[in-house]
Design a protein with these regions (language model features):
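Canonical hydrophobic alpha-helical transmembrane segment
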Residues: 69-82
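Short, hydrophobic/aliphatic alpha-helical segments
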Residues: 3, 8, 80-86
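Active-site recognition of the HExxH zinc-binding catalytic motif
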Residues: 95-108
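Selected alpha-helical membrane-embedding segments in polytopic membrane proteins
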Residues: 88-92, 108-115
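Short pre-active-site segment immediately N-terminal to the catalytic Zn-binding motif
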Residues: 81-98, 125, 129-132
């Protein structure tokens, strides 16, 4: 995709489109974003550590793929979709629609105007009045189908509790398949050398996308498991502080 300085935003299939017009970021902003990305690198290690610790602390119960039922079912659903993605030609228009809808959604959330959206088999476009790093990168870190599935099962669980039941494992598997959709198509799009990641500096964009994907998995794990949010956030904060401390110790040891 093309940086915000251009009049169009295009990419090769399966996601090609336009996110609007804006000035290219200044060198000062790019330098600040580079520094921010460098500072966030320790968080990339903290989030997976937190998920692993939550899984290790999971109560005894049925297991799937050697993991707790929610985590194993989620992973199984993602793997099954990945196999289907490799074995069967899934229409690219499904991802193009999700990709452009996510651009538009985050554009609206940021207060911009979305004036036009086009979705076709091999390409798509959306006009956003004030593109920025978040709405430009949103399709790469916000798995819209998985979020929709989580919200759907969350509402259903208000009527029919699913945690610890077979229905909960099925729900986790469906959410995992939806996340697999996001990962497979996003990786396929990134292999086309998307210029979206270059607009605000590749390192900043890469770190932000990876970190927000990790954070989504963290919150999805909490949502699908019996884990309470507040203790889970406490674990994440503690491991984040530990990772940053380790990072700073290593950095100053080399100075």
């Amino acid at each position: 995709m093309k940086p915000p300085s251009g009049s169009t935003k295009k990419s090769k299939p399966p996601a090609r489109g336009r996110a609007g017009r804006a000035r290219a970021p200044s060198r000062i902003l790019l330098a600040a974003l580079f520094a921010a990305a460098f500072a966030l690198v320790p968080a990339l290690a903290a989030v997976p550590r937190a998920i692993r610790l939550l899984e290790a602390l999971a109560p005894e119960g049925p297991s799937v793929l050697g993991l707790s039922a929610p985590a194993g079912s989620f992973l199984l659903g993602a793997c099954l979709f990945a196999l289907a993605f490799v074995a069967v030609r899934i229409p690219a228009i499904a991802y193009v629609a999700v990709h452009e809808t996510t651009h538009a959604l985050f554009g609206l959330l940021s207060g911009a105007r979305v004036t036009r959206m086009r979705v076709a088999e091999e390409a798509g476009s959306v006009d956003v009045s004030r593109p920025n790093a978040i709405n430009l990168l949103a399709p790469y870190f916000f798995p819209l189908p998985c979020v929709a599935a989580l919200l759907l099962f969350g509402l259903a669980s208000l009527v029919f509790p699913m945690a610890g039941r077979p229905a909960g494992a099925v729900a986790a598997g469906i959410c995992g398949a939806a996340w697999g959709f996001h990962v497979c198509f996003t990786l396929n799009a990134l292999l086309q050398r998307q210029t979206d990641l270059d607009a605000y500096g590749f390192l900043f964009s890469f770190v932000l996308v990876l970190l927000l994907n990790e954070l989504f998995l963290f919150f999805a794990y909490v949502a699908l498991s019996p884990v309470r949010l507040v203790p889970a956030l406490g674990i994440l904060r503690a491991l984040g502080a530990d990772s940053f401390g380790w990072f700073l110790d290593g950095l100053f040891a080399r100075i």
